[in-house]
């Protein structure tokens, strides 16, 4: 899955740069259409060429009782809360880092590369976190690198707004937060019955999307308040740490206080 998720990182590197040049050449409207046609073509190509690893089996219809079952499991609830909180901090960085770079006076030609730099770091982070997760335990790797993601926000992005610091932060945060993207599904699979992985994944991604949907207005309100950019950064960093802590509690419930347990 780590290898699979690098595809979106590659898109996150190429598309922002291409889109900037397209807007200058053909305007915003046709730039959006061109991107939409590219994505449509790639989706059609994937649907025509991908084959299931196992043949589809006859399955029973999922009932409301089955959909509610995961919410009676403490482990599931803990990781859902953790993912949801982390998404608030994660998307605050992704969406507002370029805006803050502009506000500090960074060269406009350099600002357009902030998100591609973050996604380039994320590409390698997704690969390494997936590989190390298989070797050392997926929960272990997720917890370590996501704690470090929150620490980078508070230790680097919060105190320093120089161009060099913002570029370094975008690369470091991208690398360490890559585990959040690539390990969501593996963490869920590890605590779920095989027959329920499909709809459980849908539930988790739906709930995470609520965080991604609401984080922008919340963060915008923080910036407009007296807290300003510092408030946004503290909010983002604390929620990344809090979200990771819920996943840590889920891990402790499973393994106890065995630090070296592979889980």
Region annotations inferred by a language model:
Residues 147-161:
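C-terminal ends and interior cores of transmembrane alpha-helices
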Residues 191-229, 235-236:
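A late C-terminal transmembrane helix in Major Facilitator Superfamily
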Residues 55-80:
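Juxtamembrane intracellular "pre-TM" segments in multi-pass secondary transporters
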Residues 3-54:
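Helix-loop-helix hairpin linking two adjacent transmembrane segments in secondary transporters
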Residues 1, 179-193:
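Intracellular juxtamembrane helix-capping segments at the cytosolic ends
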Residues 14-27, 101-102, 132-136, 214-227:
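Interfacial helix-cap and linker-helix signal at transmembrane-aqueous boundaries
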Residues 21-37, 218-242, 262:
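A membrane-interface helix-boundary motif in multi-pass transporters
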Residues 73-131, 135-139, 185, 215-219:
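Extracytoplasmic gate region of multi-pass secondary transporters
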